C-alpha cells in the first residue's frame, strides 16, 4: 500500500529565489515539484516567465510548467485538477511533493477548496454571452439579485460576472444561496507546511532590475514578437507583465531603456501585491530569508 507523501509549499514574491530553493528542497526530500506560476504554465513563454531552464529541471520532475498553449484557457479549477493528477503521480512514484510559485491564490484554493459549479447548458452559455455584451449592466442587474455577493466583484471583472450569470441562468439561484448549498471542500485536507521567503524591498528591486536586464539580453523582444505573430494579442497571457510593456515598445510608445524601467517598476509592484497577499492569507507560515529557509528545509529532510 502506498504511504502518505510529504508535501510542503514554498511561496514568496517574484525574483525572491523560489526556483533555486525549491530545487534544493526537492533534491533533499526526494520530491517532485509542482509550479504555481501563472506564466510558467504556458508553453513557449520561456524568457518572460523566468521559468526554470531544462538544465535546472534535470533530475527533478517538474509539473505545471509548459502545460498548455498560450491560447488555451487556464483557471483555478483546471489547476486543482492538475494538482490532483500530480499528487497521484507523486504517490505512484513514491516521491514527496514541493509546491512552489508566486501565484499563491492557487495554493489558497487548494487549502480552502472551491464550490463545484453546475454543468452549464448551451442555452445558458448563449444567454451569458449575450448578457456579457454590456458588462456594467450585467453587474448592476446581478447586484439587485445578490448585493452581498456582487459587492465583492468589480464591474470590470468579466470572469467572475460570467460565473455569477452562469449560476443564476442555469439554476435560478443567486450565487450566495448556491454556494451555501454547495460549500467548498478543501483539496489538501492534511496540514501543509508553508515556507515564505522574506526579502528586503531594496534588494528585491535590484534583483528584479537585474532579471529584467537578463531577459532583454536573452531575447525577450524576439520572444514577444513570436508570441504575437503566432497567437495575436487576444489571449489573457498576452496582458502579463513583461509582455504588455514589450508590445507597447514594439508599438513605438517608448524607447528600449524605458522598456526595461517599465517592466522593472511593474514587476516590483506585483512583488508588493504578492507579499501583501501572502501576509494576509496564510497562517502559521515559516518565514525567513532564502538562506534561513534552506537551512530549515535541508535539516528537516
Swiss-Prot record:
Instruction: Name one matching Pfam family.
Output: IPPT
Q: Which cofactor does it need?
A: Mg(2+)
Q: Which domain of life is it from?
A: Bacteria
Q: Where is this site: Interaction with substrate tRNA?
A: 103, 126
Q: Which EC numbers characterise this protein's activity in its record? A: 2.5.1.75
Record region (Interaction with substrate tRNA): 37-40
Task: Please list the GO biological process terms of this entry.
Answer: tRNA modification
- Which residues participate in substrate binding? 14-19
Keyword list (alphabetical) reads: ATP-binding, Magnesium, Nucleotide-binding, Transferase, tRNA processing
Molecular functions (GO terms): ATP binding; tRNA dimethylallyltransferase activity
Q: Which residues bind ATP?
A: 12-19
Q: Which reaction(s) are listed as its catalytic activity?
A: adenosine(37) in tRNA + dimethylallyl diphosphate = N(6)-dimethylallyladenosine(37) in tRNA + diphosphate
Q: How does it assemble?
A: Monomer.
Annotated family? Belongs to the IPP transferase family.
Protein role: Catalyzes the transfer of a dimethylallyl group onto the adenine at position 37 in tRNAs that read codons beginning with uridine, leading to the formation of N6-(dimethylallyl)adenosine (i(6)A).
Q: What is this protein called?
A: tRNA dimethylallyltransferase
Q: Which organism is this protein's natural source? A: Sulfurovum sp. (strain NBC37-1)
Amino acid at each position: 500500500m502506498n504511504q502518505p507523501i510529504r508535501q510542503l509549499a514554498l511561496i514568496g514574491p517574484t525574483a525572491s529565489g523560489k526556483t533555486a530553493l525549491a530545487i534544493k528542497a526537492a533534491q533533499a526530500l526526494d520530491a517532485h515539484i509542482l509550479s504555481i506560476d501563472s506564466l510558467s504554465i504556458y508553453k513557449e513563454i520561456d524568457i518572460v516567465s523566468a521559468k526554470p531552464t531544462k538544465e535546472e529541471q534535470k533530475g527533478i520532475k517538474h509539473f505545471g510548467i509548459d502545460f498548455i498553449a498560450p491560447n488555451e484557457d487556464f483557471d483555478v479549477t483546471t489547476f486543482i485538477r492538475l494538482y490532483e493528477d500530480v499528487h497521484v503521480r507523486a504517490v505512484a512514484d513514491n516521491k514527496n511533493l514541493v509546491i512552489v510559485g508566486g501565484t499563491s491564490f492557487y495554493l489558497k484554493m487548494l487549502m480552502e477548496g472551491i464550490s463545484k459549479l453546475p454543468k452549464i447548458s448551451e442555452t445558458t452559455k448563449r444567454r451569458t454571452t449575450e448578457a456579457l455584451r454590456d458588462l456594467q449592466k450585467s453587474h448592476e442587474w446581478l447586484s439587485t439579485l445578490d448585493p452581498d455577493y456582487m459587492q465583492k466583484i468589480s464591474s470590470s471583472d468579466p470572469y467572475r460576472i460570467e460565473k455569477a450569470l452562469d449560476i443564476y441562468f442555469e439554476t435560478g439561484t443567486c450565487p450566495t444561496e448556491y454556494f451555501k448549498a454547495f460549500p467548498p471542500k478543501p483539496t489538501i485536507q492534511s496540514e501543509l507546511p508553508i515556507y515564505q521567503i522574506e526579502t528586503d524591498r531594496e534588494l528585491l528591486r535590484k534583483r528584479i532590475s537585474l532579471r529584467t536586464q537578463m531577459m532583454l539580453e536573452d531575447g525577450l523582444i524576439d520572444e514577444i514578437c513570436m508570441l504575437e505573430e503566432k497567437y495575436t494579442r487576444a489571449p489573457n497571457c498576452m496582458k502579463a507583465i513583461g509582455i504588455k510593456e514589450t508590445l507597447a515598445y514594439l508599438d513605438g510608445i517608448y524607447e528600449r531603456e524605458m522598456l526595461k524601467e517599465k517592466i522593472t517598476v511593474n514587476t516590483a509592484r506585483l512583488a508588493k501585491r504578492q507579499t501583501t497577499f501572502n501576509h494576509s492569507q496564510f497562517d502559521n507560515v515559516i518565514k525567513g530569508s532564502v538562506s534561513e529557509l534552506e537551512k530549515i528545509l535541508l535539516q528537516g529532510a
